[in-house]
Amino acid sequence: MKIALIPGTFDPFTIGHLELVKIASSLFDKVVVCILVNPNKTHLFDEDARLSMIRRSVEAFSNVSVDIDHGYTADYAKKIGAEYIVRGIRNEIDAKYEMEMADFNLKRTGVRTLLIPAPEEIAGISSTRVREELKQGNSVEALVPEEIKSVL
C-alpha cells in the first residue's frame, strides 16, 4: 500500500490544500493530512477547529484521513509508514525551501517528497492570506473549501 503524508498547520485549510489532497488521493492508496502543531506559533484556529474543518473538507475522499501530531514531519511520516511527503509549491521561494526540506527529510528518514506545483489560478492562495482577509473583514469564500465557509 502506498501511503502519503500531507503535513501543515492548515490555519485555516484552503482550496489550495484541498487541491493537493485531490491530486494525492488519486496517486496514493492512502493519504494522511496531518496538522503539525508548532507551540511557538500563534494560531487563529485551535487544533480542534482545524481538525474539524479539514475533516469536513476531505470527507468525500475515502482514502484520506486526518490527524494531529506534535512532532517533526519526517518522524511522523516514518511512524505511519508513508513513502512520500506531499507538498505544494506556489512560487520559486516555496520551491527552494521545499527542496531543502525534501533533502533533509530523505537523509534523516529515507522518506521522499513529492512537490506539486499549484495551478496558476490558486497559486496566490495561502492560509496567511485567508487570515489577513478575515482580519480586515473581507470575504474569504473564494479561498476556502465550500464545506467550511459557514465556519469562517
Language-model region placement:
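Nucleotidyltransferase catalytic core that binds NTPs
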Residues: M1-L152
